[in-house]
Amino acid sequence: TFGVATLGFRYKNFKAEGSVFTGREPDENRYDFDKARFDSYSYRLSFNPTENWVLQFSQGFINSPEALEPDEDVKRTTASVLYSKKINMDKHFSGAAIWGLNDKGVDHKEHSFLLEGNYQFMKNAIYSRYEYIQKSKEELDLDNGFPGERFNVHAFTAGYNRQLISFNNIDLNVGTQLTVNGVDKDLQNLYGKTPVSFQVYLQLRPSLHKH
């Protein structure tokens, strides 16, 4: 978005932040600057009970984010729990549970949920992820006569990657992952019952900071 101003406050293990920003998503002309309207706002609260845990809650009140639906505002709510543990110099585990809700009114509320974990050992990592999301008929570009208003989509991913080289605090990794999807029964004629995807990838990322 174009135009964001944020103010934060920290006290011991608590942190509070507030932001004002432009609710409308950028237009199709990606090479210019849209007008900053500062017509939306959000707040976020977080708490670190220990050095390993982070608890977070946030809400955003977004004014007319979609150009095709200019009269619809969105209240977005999120909550998350993050965990990170350094087991020893060569082993590290991290995990996350994240929930979100887009609320456009009584008949248009869409939930999402993410649960993932990553275990890093030496130059190797194994990870898994579960994703759940609700999609509306409009987002899936379905006809008005299509049965149902919201549709549940699930995805289960398992993967492995290995560091090939590291230079200037940047790691180059190679990895592979498999994803199995669970599709709402009303969508199975379009997408199948359990679509499966397989991926091999190269990844550039910052090196893990070591104390």
Regions found by a protein language model. Name each.
Residues F14-E66:
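Loop-centered beta-sheet repeat module
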Residues Y11-N13, V20-P26, Q59-P65, K85, ...:
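Transmembrane beta-strands of outer-membrane beta-barrel pores
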Residues R30, E69, L140-L142, D186-L190:
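Outer-membrane beta-barrel and related beta-rich outer-membrane complex signature
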Residues T1-A5, R10-K12, R37-Y41, D73-T77, ...:
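Residues that define the transmembrane beta-barrel architecture of outer-membrane proteins
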Residues Q59-L68, E72, K91-S112, A125-G159, ...:
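Outer-membrane beta-barrel translocator/channel fold
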Residues L7, A16-G18, L45, L55-F57, ...:
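Membrane-embedded beta-strand positions of outer-membrane beta-barrel proteins
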Residues A158, G192-H211:
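Outer-membrane beta-barrel "beta-signal"
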Residues F9-E17, E51-F57, N88-G95, K123-S128, ...:
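Repeated loop/turn-to-beta-strand initiation elements of outer-membrane beta-barrel proteins
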